[in-house]
Amino acid sequence: MSKRILCKFFAHGACLKGEHCEFSHDWKDPTNNICTYYQKGICSYGSRCRYEHVKASRPHPSASSSSAVPRPSPASASNTLACAFLPGVAERDLSPVPSSSLKPTWNLDSLHQDSVDEVKTSNPGTVKPEELPICSFAAAGDCPRGNECPHIHGTICPTCGKCCLHPFRPDEREEHKKVCEKKHKQLEALKLSQEIECCVCLERVLSKATPAERKFGLLTECDHAFCIACIRNWRSSSPSTGMDVNSTLRACPICRKLSYFVVPSVIWFSAPEEKKEIMDNYREKLRSIDCKHFSFGDGNCPFGTSCFYKHAYHDGRLEEVVLRHLDAEDGQTVIAKDIRLSDFLENMHI
């Protein structure tokens, strides 16, 4: 057994350094499970923190390194206390060594204080089950401590198959199920999208050369698959003389159904509800971006009320949308665009 302290990240199954970690990854080594944020008074987890909220005793620093006076025979008292509270620690491993070979990260006095506080706070009647953290080793698949683990072993999630559901936190358990099911559906949709080919270039969309090309261009009125580059090139072509834009460029190249806009997406939908969700999320994202044509009220957006971007003024006020309905001679009703005085003044030659 080494003389290093047990890595607190390894104890919770979250050490990323592995064999290169400067702390011990041996369960026989002593632990120092004190919350450092609690010592500073800024722990935001409170009673739900997985680390101990106790006041650690700190060694008194000496005036200078040359005048430091060692404590009278600390080895025997420290060994006795450590062996009493840590049965797995042998006295031969706690023999005094030169101070130059030790790192001042912890001492036996603080370890004894931690053990005393742990004994005082280990009364099961003082800690509620919902306040205990879930064992990350059991959630990952196997806990080496088994029934002696101080943390709670969760129940199995029916979607991901991990023991990560806290049995005493119903809200957290339901939230995990919803998030897990959503991620599972996204992975299934991404798996199905790998085989979808573009109807124009006949290539697999997600197998394109560059990441910018690995997107689908969804049309609102039909379910034909196109890559974003092909459908945008189709709709941006210059129409011939006398050609109707709506019936040629804005229509689907396959079924000729009219779609007014294209929605980029990294996955392909398998149901109408999924397509609607993708389009709603796309519109919601654009609403948070300021329109460059509107320019906080200083410009004029050619799309008017049909613009998906945010029309906000310098003071944060949103543009009030007022639709003007005009009745035509044939009985149809059309929506007129906003007419500004500046449009007339620009055409006047004064």
Curated annotation (Swiss-Prot):
- Provide GO CC annotations from the record: nucleus
Q: Which PROSITE patterns match?
A: ZF_C3H1, ZF_RING_1, ZF_RING_2
Database matches in SUPFAM superfamilies: CCCH zinc finger, RING/U-box
Cross-referenced CDD domains: RING-HC_MKRN
Q: Tell me the InterPro entries matching this sequence.
A: MKRN-like, Znf-CCCH_4, Znf_CCCH, Znf_CCCH_sf, Znf_RING, Znf_RING/FYVE/PHD, Znf_RING_CS
Compartment(s) of residence: Nucleus
Keyword terms of this UniProt record: DNA-binding, Metal-binding, Nucleus, Repeat, Transferase, Zinc, Zinc-finger
Q: This protein is called what?
A: Putative RING-type E3 ubiquitin transferase C3H69
Q: Which organism is it from?
A: Arabidopsis thaliana (Mouse-ear cress)
